[in-house]
UniProtKB/Swiss-Prot annotation:
Mediates both low-affinity uptake and efflux of sugar across the plasma membrane. GO terms for biological process: carbohydrate transport. This is Bidirectional sugar transporter SWEET7a. Its main location: membrane. It comes from Oryza sativa subsp. japonica.
Length: 260
């Protein structure tokens, strides 16, 4: 007979793979930033970094090194990379703003860690405080793509909608919700359940406005070429009645051929 713990481990392993995909989903955007030298600010990486930082705290407090810890450790390593890259390459006013945001996150994280470790003396209360913060930041992470939904509705275009992120967020939230239902954990159930709802809304909007999105024109489309063909036809002397100076003239006939 299959035990609930074995089922939970199997679901957790699959959830690991999907969570890796969630943290890797900004990679195509990051590659475009490097390729096109785009300095536009991206909010998602900062939120992912903060979310990963706070999800490390319950594992440290509970001394748990397992399925969840593997995912969050990977996210903590990967998430800040695009943000730090943009800070290094960004030379406009957004650079200073991003530096302030990251510094504020680091200070807030340090304050929470010191406050919990020094001010709270039981593991149960520490887990409760940090768990609440995890719920808040996980919810922010899942809801962050909703910031472009108003633009999608206004323009009736899904051009700037992060489809890959929405799909992976939906699968990630669905799996981790299933994971916690086998053995209930409210701190994982609430944010991931909301994540399923938020991602479903994003996918529904994508289906609705996909057909109304203007199609991009092919930049490699070849236009018709115009080839002038000149024919020189000499004409004898023109009578003085037609030319007051008595000079000779020539008529040039130009044929234009359009080749598709």
């Amino acid at each position: 007979m299959v035990s609930p713990d074995m089922i939970r481990n199997v679901v957790g392993i699959v959830g690991n793979v999907i969570s890796f995909g969630l943290f890797l989903s900004p990679v195509p955007t990051f590659w475009q930033i490097i390729k096109n030298k785009n300095k536009n600010k991206k909010k998602m990486e900062v939120v992912l970094a903060a979310e990963a930082l706070f999800m490390v705290s319950p594992d440290m407090i509970r001394n748990v090194v397992g399925i969840v810890g593997n995912v969050i450790s990977f996210g903590l390593f990967l998430s800040p990379v695009p943000t730090f890259w943009q800070i290094i390459k960004n030379k406009n006013k957004n650079k200073k703003k991003m530096e302030v945001v990251l510094a504020a996150e680091a200070l807030f994280m340090a304050a929470v860690a010191l406050g919990v470790l020094l001010g709270v003396h039981t593991h149960q209360r520490r887990s409760l405080i940090v768990g609440i913060l995890c719920v808040i930041f996980d919810t922010i992470m899942y809801s962050s793509p909703l910031t472009v939904m108003s633009q999608v509705v206004k323009t009736k275009s899904v051009e700037y909608m992060p489809l890959l992120l929405s799909v992976v967020s939906f699968l990630n939230g669905l799996y981790w919700t299933s994971y916690t239902l086998i053995r209930f954990d409210i701190f994982i159930t609430i944010p991931n359940g909301l994540g399923v709802l938020f991602a479903a809304v994003q996918l529904i909007l994508y289906v609705i406005y996909y057909r109304t999105t203007p199609k991009k024109q092919n930049k490699n489309l070849e236009l018709p070429t115009v080839t002038p063909v000149a024919k020189d036809t000499s004409v004898g002397p023109i009578s003085k009645d037609n030319d007051l100076n008595g000079s000779t003239a020539s008529h040039v006939t130009i044929d234009i051929t359009i080749q598709p």
